[in-house]
């Protein structure tokens, strides 16, 4: 991928390099398999490639969370990507791992075994904490116990329509780029993609041969988002498949059992695109 064509991503890589070489704290990267976390991991690989061997001196953990009630197609893809990242990242001290909820905190253990009511909108949502947040926090805490402190990289974005220049020469790392975690002591949060708009994400991922550093095809990832309803930021990549509408790529692939929504739109799209085995049993 040519970073000269994407100066925003080049600047993010330079900023990442500054943060990475600042200290010896290991990085923890949340990877869901979606477009944002895929881009984040791509840029981490690209950054590490620019370093000398002696500068690569700490672990980068790529962490995927399997709730055990994921959409089967998304789950399979996430596991495959996590494994490939670990395989191709060994030379950069990248270690991939899939984490799971404790058996007594799984969705079915809570719902059937403990008699929890089903999660309901607007705010009764115990599932996210038990299935995703707690397993991740447990891994973070264990890593802190072994290393003292950690830096957590997240692929969250403001999704602004215009990109704000990210000058790094005069930016402080502590308290500016790295923010103390609100709940976990000795954990610091770094959000390098904050200002990157949607169309830049897809333009970068689908540039050139559209392959990731771990040799997966981003065109397949793009196909998982096909058919998403248009939003404020229309993707400039509708021409990827002229037979399908342009998309924003904003969709969230939820759990197949989710009771927080009336209709699982992502599941419906998979069914409409031929995955009829996903149709609910009557």
Could you describe each region identified by the protein language model?
Residues 1-28, 37-282:
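Nucleotide-activated chemistry modules centered on ATP-dependent adenylation/adenylyltransferase
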